[in-house]
Amino acid sequence: MAQYEAVIGLEVHVELKTRSKIFCDSTTEFGGDPNTHVCPVCLGLPGVLPVVNKKVVEYAIRAALALNCQIAGFSKFDRKNYYYPDMPKNYQISQYDLPIARNGYIEIDVNGKRKRIGITRLHMEEDTGKLVHQGTITTTPFSLVDYNRAGVPLIEIVSEPDLRSPEEARQYMEKLRAVIQYTGVSDCKMEEGSLRCDANVSVRPAGSIAFGTKTEIKNLNSFKALQRALAYEIERQIDVLEEGGRVVQETRTWDEGKGITLPMRTKEEAHDYRYFPDPDLVPLVIDREWVEDIRRSLPELPDEKRERYMREYALPAYDAGVLTSTRELAGFFEACVQGYPNPKIVSNWIMGDLLRLLNAGNIEIQDCPVKPGQLVSMLRLIEKGTISGKIAKTVFEEMFATGRDAEDIVKEKGLVQISDEGAIAAIVDQVIAGNPRTVEDYRSGKEKALGFLVGQVMKATRGKANPELVNRLLKEKI
């Protein structure tokens, strides 16, 4: 079997978080009743004219700068002509040959090394309406159209074909989402459609420089779907080639239930859309000083914050990467460190117990029932010896479930750590007397035996004995 490599490029659509749409003043609010957030402009009624929302241009420049793009001094809007029920004008206002930004990049970690993924272009366009299918897209007897989304401002970010695996594609998407979220121009919620992705993928013999025939995959509404769809499509294309067939250039949809891609239509080329400049919109002349003002207003971005955490807090690269993966998580961490200046301990609790509980409950960090001040208070109890680290885990789960403070839970449940040496010594004596064989094992050099004896003492005290004191007394008495 010949060895193949995948060649992947992503087209990512990001809805911008402006109050009004790109060419009219209809609201962009998510979740209204169908066809209530519309006006004659976004419905494409005769006699209306679009007017560019300046905030959209600002947000596009802001995102482009964060992605290391070069901003155009001159840009324009074009009509992309096609016929589809979710497009009321029968054309989409987009940008073709003069996008607002080009030649950017972001970096991802691949096998412990930084890999730069090129960004071909970033351009502005209006979103389409939304088709609501009765059933799946391939089985529905009819579809309904909701135009609330029509005219919502988008930026499309087109990557170079620099990705070589589904895992790299997922990393790229996660990093792209983080960068955009940090800028504040979008919430990037895939479940609400404010971050969407189409994937172009082909395969070629390993070592070849020629591209294979690509397919485009749509309906990728999660990182998991992106990774699974690419893995399936790569395998499908290799199977076609191995059997002597020919990969067809087409658009395919991802069927999450069946775990397969299905053909939708033949893949269009640029000339199929008959692009031409929109005669109702004047070209954009971008003032350089305005661009520099926007650049100066950018916040600390994920890579910069990650490097600072490693330098300032002495965190490992992995910890720093996880903690800076979202702006909200980084904010939670920094709020904790302000109150409890031991970054590694804070990092361990956030990356361990906190993220585990958040993931299990499918809860975002901004909705976390445990606030930074509450976590700090619990860490202070451990530091003072009021509770042990083991008991703290039980306390933290109760805090997460109820939102209550650690002090109240410890007091109510009687979880204060036993640090009375005499009381612990008596229990240690009982454990030593009851486990003579284990005691002899420890005396003969078996270190693990001590762990068993410590466990027996902790069991007898329901986990409340001071573990350092238990260890010392056992060693002294044995």
UniProtKB/Swiss-Prot annotation:
Keyword ATP-binding: yes
Superkingdom per UniProt: Bacteria
InterPro entries listed in its UniProt record: Asn/Gln-tRNA_amidoTrfase_suB/E (IPR017959), Asn/Gln-tRNA_Trfase_suB/E_cat (IPR006075), Asn/Gln_amidotransferase (IPR018027), Asn/Gln_tRNA_amidoTrase-B-like (IPR003789), GatB (IPR004413), GatB_C_1 (IPR042114), GatB_Yqey_C_2 (IPR023168), Gln-tRNA_amidoTrfase_suB_CS (IPR017958)
Catalytic class of the enzyme: ligase
One of the record's GO molecular function terms: glutaminyl-tRNA synthase (glutamine-hydrolyzing) activity
GO biological process: glutaminyl-tRNAGln biosynthesis via transamidation; translation
Catalytic activity: L-glutamyl-tRNA(Gln) + L-glutamine + ATP + H2O = L-glutaminyl-tRNA(Gln) + L-glutamate + ADP + phosphate + H(+); L-aspartyl-tRNA(Asn) + L-glutamine + ATP + H2O = L-asparaginyl-tRNA(Asn) + L-glutamate + ADP + phosphate + 2 H(+)
Gene3D superfamilies: 1.10.10.410, GatB domain, N-terminal subdomain
Key words, A-Z: ATP-binding, Ligase, Nucleotide-binding, Protein biosynthesis
EC number in record: 6.3.5.-
Stored Pfam families: GatB_N (PF02934), GatB_Yqey (PF02637)
This protein's record includes keyword Ligase: yes
Family: Belongs to the GatB/GatE family. GatB subfamily.
NCBIfam families in alphabetical order: gatB, PRK05477.1-2, PRK05477.1-4, PRK05477.1-5
General function of this protein: Allows the formation of correctly charged Asn-tRNA(Asn) or Gln-tRNA(Gln) through the transamidation of misacylated Asp-tRNA(Asn) or Glu-tRNA(Gln) in organisms which lack either or both of asparaginyl-tRNA or glutaminyl-tRNA synthetases. The reaction takes place in the presence of glutamine and ATP through an activated phospho-Asp-tRNA(Asn) or phospho-Glu-tRNA(Gln).
Quaternary data: Heterotrimer of A, B and C subunits.
Protein name: Aspartyl/glutamyl-tRNA(Asn/Gln) amidotransferase subunit B
Species assigned in the record: Pelotomaculum thermopropionicum (strain DSM 13744 / JCM 10971 / SI)
